[in-house]
Structure formats: structure tokens, C-alpha cells
Amino acid sequence: MESSLIHHIIIVLLLLWFISSLNRSHAFFYFLALIYLYLVHERYVMRLKRKLQFEERKQANQRRVLSDSESVRWMNYAVEKIWPICMEQIASQKILGPIIPWFLEKYRPWTAKKAVIQHLYMGRNPPLLTDIRVLRQSTGDDHLVLELGMNFLAADDMSAILAVKLRKRLGFGMWTKLHLTGMHVEGKVLIGVKFLRRWPFLGRLRVCFAEPPYFQMTVKPIFTHGLDVAVLPGIAGWLDKLLSIAFEQTLVQPNMLVVDMEKFVSPTSENWFFVDEKEPVAHVLVEVFEASDLKPSDLNGLADPYVKGKLGAYRFKTKIQKKTLSPKWHEEFKIPIFTWDSPSILNIEVGDKDRFVDDTLGECSVNIEEFRGGQRNDMWLSLQNIKMGRLHLAITVIEDNAKSSDDPLKKAKLNKEDIQTSFASDTTNLGSFSSDKSPSVVDNFEPIKIDGQEETAIWVQKPGAEVSQIWEPRKGKSRRLDSQIQRTPNDESLSNGSSSTDDNQEGSKNPMKSVGRGLRKIGSMFHRNVKKEEFLIGSIEEESQSQSPRINLKAVNQKDVGLNFIVDDNLSGPLSGKSLDGESLDAEENSGKGHMKDVAKSFLKQAEKSAKQIKHAFSRKGSMKPRDGHKEIVPESDSGTDSESSDDDDAFTCVKNLATEPGKLTRDGNIERTGDDDHVDSTTLATAKEDSSGDILEDSTDVEAKEEKLKEAAESETRDMDTAMNIKTEDEKGDTLKNIEEGEEKESSSK
């Protein structure tokens, strides 16, 4: 390093001596000489730091304990022994020899018309593998992917001769030689291996850098002991830029070098390598129109602005507009994008062209991913770092959809919105969602990969979010919808245990209803079994038909959202023999005392009818004589005229109360109580009627006594009802009793 730096110092001193001999000595030349030596010194210091870091890492790797990435010291030792024997020749002549001309042809500088490599020797030092590890996941079809930390620092005996033919306008078409006497490469290398079942068993090797590597060369023109032009301020920057572009576009992931091992080991000479340059997935069209309100940077109050941009490894620059603060360029640049996985940030800088160092007039950045979709986005951007200045741009992202249209999986994803729309239309017809619009469900398409098929033809479609039925909550008293009374065959029984609790609750809450229910029970005991069964079945059918639908479910295509209060029918059941189906719940709950008086009157009428029915039953029993000491039971097919002409509403009311009482409907239509209640059936009723009328039929005077007892019972029923209601006056009671006595006198006179 010292000898090379001394060479530069000697050159500077000679130039200064020559200028002073011409009487052109000026402080400005000394200042330029100082800047030149400073830049050269910085370049040498950077190289020295890299060499020292290399030595430190080399020693640290030798002492390091094994971790996730192994140090593979055994491999470095083996390569060090094999390298001077055969590996160096294979690397320089078989691998790099065919590849370097391709690089020179594609990335040669504009000053060179042609470039060829005449000699290449890598030196005695082999590449050093700092660490190695296996990547479990592979993005391609490689069977094995290795990540190696490589560090190659060439020895002093490295030599490479590069012949360059200059262009005629620059060097009159002369040939010159460049000597590469040093090289330093450091970075992470990815190696993908694909195996074969036949010779040579290694089908393909893919090599690339995981990230842009550090690369430095020592280039000397004409002879090997000359000046290193790679450290000169102008040439050094230009050479670094050229090498970085060459590496990033060819050997940095996702671009990689592919080696066909079958052709590589074949005896015939074939082109065994090629560069796998990944095709861009999109292009960005950047249109630079104009700028306004730029900052004056020159002494004349103007500027010479230009725009340069950078997106990844690609750069662009506009032309220079002279002496203006509102330049107009109207230039466009097309930049490729290879992947959307990494951030795509377009960095733009507006500069002022000067003779030595360009000034910065402002910077701005744009995220390209925000403008995807193929639309042209025209915008004015404010320049940062400077308080003034704006830039007029237009950005258009042109995506390459040629391949995506052929992929059936992507087609399915493109039609995802259609699938969501059809799903939403189907679910609205089900009527099970609580809102008009069904929730948006994003379907997931999971491809099923089949060995031997390049394209996937089978997917598993899964909804993105499970949609369950949302039931509307009910307010008010809860009701079990599955405890409905339905018509069943005669050999089956119905259990009405659930209704008993409702009846008990109602009886305890309202004594008026318990009194009315007792009167209806007395009248229903003396009805015929056939008529009782007919009315019972008819009431069951009518109740099942008139039963309300499921309130908590919406009907098909129903759009309103609301709450329906459910109240049991038992809470608002009929209080008289007539049906109250036409009355609404609100009307019954909001009725006043006048309505309660009408209800009390209806109870009295019901009591009167019950008394008539009891008296009519005993009168029919009195007209029959016992035969052979046995009591005769009236056949079920025989019915009286009065019984047939009884009011249907009375019968329906009585039967409905029987249906709501706790018990079971037996095969012959009788009611069988459960719990501590009395067991009542048709035979028991008939026996009770015969026992109660056995002695009365022998003597007519006993009939009169029975009628008196019935009167007393009716009076006691009336008194109990008046006490419970507290709304019946004494006049109404007297009229009612008078009507009952008149009715009894008429019946006795007719007998």
C-alpha cells in the first residue's frame, strides 16, 4: 500500500513542479492536489479495512463453536490442499473462462469497442467458506439449497490480462491491456442442486448471491507495476457503478447462474451454462414533465436543473435545462420490476449541474405499490429537504398479465368477487340472517398438487369465515315451540305436563279464572264421551292450524328488522264460553272496569247454563227404571235434543280447559289425571251418576231436595265470585237468583 500511495504523491509533486516552472503557480492547483491525495488515501484505507476484517473473520471462524451455520473448517482445509492441484484450473479455465467474455460483451464501457480476456490465473489462495447451512424451504424445484458465506481475497500472484480495443474517436482504434492484479469478493452465496437418477447424478446447479456482494479489483494499465487506475477518483466511481450493475442484474437473487452439469461433464464441447435472468412481473412508466419554484443555486439567481431517479438497481437521468427555475423536460422512462415482495420505492432527486460538485435542489420518494392497477397517476410532488420547489410527474404501473391469465388458480382468484356475489344472493334467500345484506365471505382456494402435473387442476375451496345462523332474541315470557299440541293416532298419548305449570301459575295469579274454570268443569262432566272426543280432536286441529309460526325466524325475502313479543295463549285465554280469538292482546290488557263487569255477567250466565245441564241430566236419569237390579248406562250413540243443540262455543271452551289440565288423553278419549288429582274416566262418571241417582229415582220428593241443593251450590258459587271480583252489586245478584228460581219453577211445572 505504501509503494502505491508513494507513486501518487510523486506524480502530484511532479505536476506541481511543472506548473511552477511555467510561472503558473497558484494556490488553486495546490488545493486540487490536496483533494486528489485525500480521495486516493480514502480508497486505500477502505481496502486496508476490508483486508483486516477478512483476517479477523478467518481467525474467528477457526475458533468458533458450531452453531446453526457450521464453520466447515474441514472443507476449507481440503479445498486449500486441492486448490493448487486442480481446483484453480477448473475454476479459471472451465467455469470463469466461458462466463467472463459474456459479461464483457454485455457490460463493457462505452469507450471500449471490444474486450477479450487473454489470460486468467486466480492465485494460490482458495475461496474461504466462513459458514454453511441448509435452507429447509426451496422456492423452486431444487432438491437441496445451501447458503454459504464466501470470502475470496486473491493472493499477490493473481494475474489476469484483459485486452481492450478503444473506439476510433477516443483512441483511434488502438488495443491496450489492463492487468488485474488483485480481487476481493465477499458475500452470501446460494447454491441450488437438482439431482438425477443417472450419470452424472447432478443435473443442475444454480448459483447466485443472496444480496449484492462487496467486490473490489486492482486494475493497472499497460504493465503490472504501473499505477492502479481503480483508485483514481473518477475511474473508481465509474468502475464500482459498472460492477454493481453487472452483479445485480445477473448474479444477485432472483437472477442466478444456471449450470447444466450433463453438458459440463460431456466429452463434446457444448455451451453448458446460461444466465437465468428473471423476467419482470411489471414495468413502471415514469413521465417527468416539469418543475416549478426551484431554489436558485447559481450566482445569477438561476439554476441548471436535472432529475435523476433510482428504483432498485435501475437508475435514470433527464437532460440538463440551462438557466431556468421552471424547467420542462417531457421525458419518460420505463423501469422493470422483478418482484413485489420487496419494497418498490422510487427515489427522485432534483440537482443543479455545476462544474465540480452538483448541488441538490430537493428530493422526494414514491411508493410504486400504491399505484398498481394500470391507471395513469398524474401528480405534483413537493421537494423535501428544501422548503421550496415542486415536481410534476406521471406514474403508470403496467403489469404483465400474460402468464397470470393462463393459470387457472389465478383465474379463480380473479373471479372471487363473482363468487362472493353469488354466495350473498344465495344466503339472502335462506332467510336465516338477521340483516338484509349477508356478510362478505372471502373464499380461500387451496391448490392440490399432483405429482407429474405441471398445472394444478384441483382446488379445495374453503370459506374465509364460518357464517352461522344468527337467531333473533325473544322478549317477554319464554315459550317452547316444540311443545305444541298436534293430532296423533288414537293409540298414542299426549303429555301435557308443560301446560300444567302454566295453569298453576295462572290460577295462583288470578282467582277469577279459577272460579270460571271450576264452573266449566262441572258442566263438562256430564257430556257424552263421543261428543267430548269429537270436540277435543277438533280443538286440537284448530289449535295446531291457528298456531303462530316461528317468530324468531324471518320469512323468505323479509327485510324488516324488529322484535315480536310472545305471550302464551293461556295468559289471555277465553273467560267465557264464546271464543275470543278476534280480540287482540292489547285490547284485553287495556280494558277497564266496564269490561270486567261484562265478564262477571258472562260467568253468571255460564253458571245458569251449568245448572240447567245438571238438572237436565238428572231429569233424564229419573225417567229410566233399573232392570234386574242393575243400573242402566245410557249408550254413547244416544244423545238428547238439548245436548245436541248446545252451544258450540260452550263445548269448545270446556274441552279446551280439559286439554289444558294436566293429564293424558287415553285411547278411548278419556282424561286421565296425573299426580294427586282424582282419576276420572267415562265408567267412573257413569257409576257416579248412577250412584247419585239410585235412590232419587224411587222417590220424586228426593228430586226436589236435590234441586234445592243445586240452588244452594249456585248461590255459593255466585257469592264466591262476587267476593273475588268486588264489582257486582246487590241488585244484579237479586236479579240473577230470581231468574234462576223462575227457570226452575218452569221446569218443575212442565214435569
From Swiss-Prot:
Protein name: C2 domain-containing protein At1g53590
Lineage: Eukaryota, Viridiplantae, Streptophyta, Embryophyta, Tracheophyta
Biased composition (Basic residues): 612-624
Biological process terms in GO annotation: lipid transport
CDD domains linked to this entry: C2, SMP_SF
Source organism per UniProt: Arabidopsis thaliana (Mouse-ear cress)
Every SMP-LTD domain range: 68-262
Region (Disordered): 469-519, 572-751
Gene name per UniProt: NTMC2T6.1
Binding positions for Ca(2+) 2 per the UniProt entry: 298, 352, 354, 359
